[in-house]
Regions:
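Non-catalytic positions within long, well-ordered alpha-helices that form the structural scaffold/packing
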Residues: 7-8, 121, 143
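N-terminal leader/targeting and accessory segments in enzymes
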Residues: 1-40
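Conserved nucleotide-sensing/catalytic segment adjacent to the nucleotide-binding pocket
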Residues: 101-130
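Glycine-rich phosphate-binding loop used to anchor ATP phosphates in small-molecule kinases
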Residues: 124-138, 142
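Walker A (P-loop) phosphate-binding motif
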Residues: 43-93, 98
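Acidic, Mg2+-coordinating active-site environments of NTP-dependent enzymes
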Residues: 16, 20-25, 122-123, 138, ...
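Residue-level signal for inorganic ion chemistry
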Residues: 6, 41, 58, 86, ...
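Flexible beta-alpha connector loops of hexameric P-loop NTPases
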Residues: 98-109, 158-166
Length: 194
């Protein structure tokens, strides 16, 4: 139903893992993984805004939001308030009231993520502090995104279950991806498994 609606609204092509009858008449870009493709296409569509930001990414079972706000406050002083924030509570894309709003996810969906990065860059932001949930990696919302600094706070079995991570190993693997994709890493010395 979404494809038919998009077609009615003027879509000129669609990206999917298979062709759909509702897309007849539209070019189909067939990919192996829609979520990964969406992240890469989002970055390209919005002109790779991440390349214009110094990005500090924070992951952990507990403490992401508090750490993000501490980092934001410290960097605000050294960047003359040219810092964006993507947290569980708020997204701040600039210094005007309309650039500050409540978040609906810890880490936004890929199109929202790159859109908001573009707005932040266009608003003169030079730095971004963002929380990165393990679900963001599991769902490939941030596929292809690299960070200047990655901070790994901790890990515990809080999010193990059928709705999030089936095993602790899966949760750990997702969180470790932040380290793999960071130029520099900070790891809490008290974190088990490290």
């Amino acid at each position: 139903k979404y494809l038919a609606s998009a077609k009615e609204k003027g879509a000129i092509a669609y990206v999917a893992e298979k062709e759909y009858p509702e897309g007849e008449g539209l070019p189909a870009i067939i990919v192996n993984d829609e979520q990964k493709a969406m992240s890469l296409l989002g970055a390209a569509f919005y002109g790779y805004p991440q390349n214009d930001l110094f990005i500090i990414a924070i992951t952990g079972t507990k403490g992401k939001t508090t750490t993000a706000y501490f980092a934001d406050h410290i960097l605000a002083q050294s960047t003359a308030d040219h810092i964006a924030l993507f947290s569980t509570l708020d997204r701040i894309l600039g210094n005007k009231p309309e650039d500050k709003f409540k978040s609906d996810l810890t880490t936004p969906e890929s199109l929202d993520l790159f859109h908001d990065m573009r707005v932040a860059v266009d608003n003169g932001m030079t730095h971004l502090v963002m929380e990165v949930s393990s679900q963001a990696y599991k769902k490939n919302r941030i596929y292809g995104l690299k960070y200047d600094v990655g901070i790994f706070l901790n890990i515990s079995p809080d999010h193990i279950g059928r709705n999030e991570h089936p095993t602790f190993a899966d949760s750990l693997h997702c969180k470790e991806q932040l380290l793999v994709n960071s130029a520099k890493c900070l790891i809490n010395a008290e974190t088990e498994k490290f």
